[in-house]
């Protein structure tokens, strides 16, 4: 009887570990392959005064041969983004005012391949999913500074 209990507990532990192994590797988002599959991008730089109003907005359309496109692609391709499972839009708010840079990548048929938004307060969102950003020079705040410098 004792052996069956041990086997049962061991089986449950194995199932939990298997579930974790299946969940966590899929938490990483591959930005580089989405960027490589794209031929154009749009970049939106925003200064947001409060929840209801953007004070300033600048939108640029970039083709793959544009130097700014290449610089942005180099910055984003070097990032590691991991999904945050515990953060939802409804429970998140910024300290206003806040600035943001949003990059949308598209293929030849104008299908959206990637939507990346980073805020000056260090928040990052990829394809409507909050992410933790790891960059060679820091986190999301540093990525925001790099992208804002490229598009200004």
Please identify what each model-predicted range represents.
Residues 2-152:
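Function-determining sites in protein domains
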